[in-house]
C-alpha cells in the first residue's frame, strides 16, 4: 500500500514531527533509505514484512533469569504498569534512566543509547551493566564505537570494532 500526502496528513505535521524526521535522517536515515531503494521490489516487500513482524518489546527467560528486551527504554515508567500499556514513543525513543532500577526480579536490556553517552560510565563503548539494566548499544556508528553482543546464557560479552 502506497502512503500519500493529503491535505489532512499535511495538517497533522507539526514542528516536533519535522524535528524527529530530521534527526532520523541525520542519524542514518538517508543512507538507509538510499540502500532500501537500491533493492528490488520483492526484496523491499520482504524487508517491510520482516520489520512489520517486530515486537515493541519481548520478555524472555534464560537459565531462570528474566529479561525485558526493548529498543530504547521504558518512558513514563511505573512499577506496576504492564508492558503492553506503554506507548510506542516510550519504548523506541525514550532513553533509559541508567540510575534507576526498573525491576528487582528481571533485567531490562536496551539499545538506542550508545554507552559512550551514558553519564559516569566507566567503560564507554562497551556493554554497560548497572541497576538490573544492561545497555548493549556500543556505538558502532560512532568513531571509536563497536558492535557489542551479550550471550545471555553466561553473560559473556563479545565485540567487533567498527571500521572507520
Enumerate the predicted regions with their spans:
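Short, basic/aromatic-enriched C-terminal tail that caps enzymatic domains
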Residues: 146-164
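Short, small-residue-biased leader/transition segments that mark boundaries at the very start
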Residues: 1-5
Amino acid at each position: 500500500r502506497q502512503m500519500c500526502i493529503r491535505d489532512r496528513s499535511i495538517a497533522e505535521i507539526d514542528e516536533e514531527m519535522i524535528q524527529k524526521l530530521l534527526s532520523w535522517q541525520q542519524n542514518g536515515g538517508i543512507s538507509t533509505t538510499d540502500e532500501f531503494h537500491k533493492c528490488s521490489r520483492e526484496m523491499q516487500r520482504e524487508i517491510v514484512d520482516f520489520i512489520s513482524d517486530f515486537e515493541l518489546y519481548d520478555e524472555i527467560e534464560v537459565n531462570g533469569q528474566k529479561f525485558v528486551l526493548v529498543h530504547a527504554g521504558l518512558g513514563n515508567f511505573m512499577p506496576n504498569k504492564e508492558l503492553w500499556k506503554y506507548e510506542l514513543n516510550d519504548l523506541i525513543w525514550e532513553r533509559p534512566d541508567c540510575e534507576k532500577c526498573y525491576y528487582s526480579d528481571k533485567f531490562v536490556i536496551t539499545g538506542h543509547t550508545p554507552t559512550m553517552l551514558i553519564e559516569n560510565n566507566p567503560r564507554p563503548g562497551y556493554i554497560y551493566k548497572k541497576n538490573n539494566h544492561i545497555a548493549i548499544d556500543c556505538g558502532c556508528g560512532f568513531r571509536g564505537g563497536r558492535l557489542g553482543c551479550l550471550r545471555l546464557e553466561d553473560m559473556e560479552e563479545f565485540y567487533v570494532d567498527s571500521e572507520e
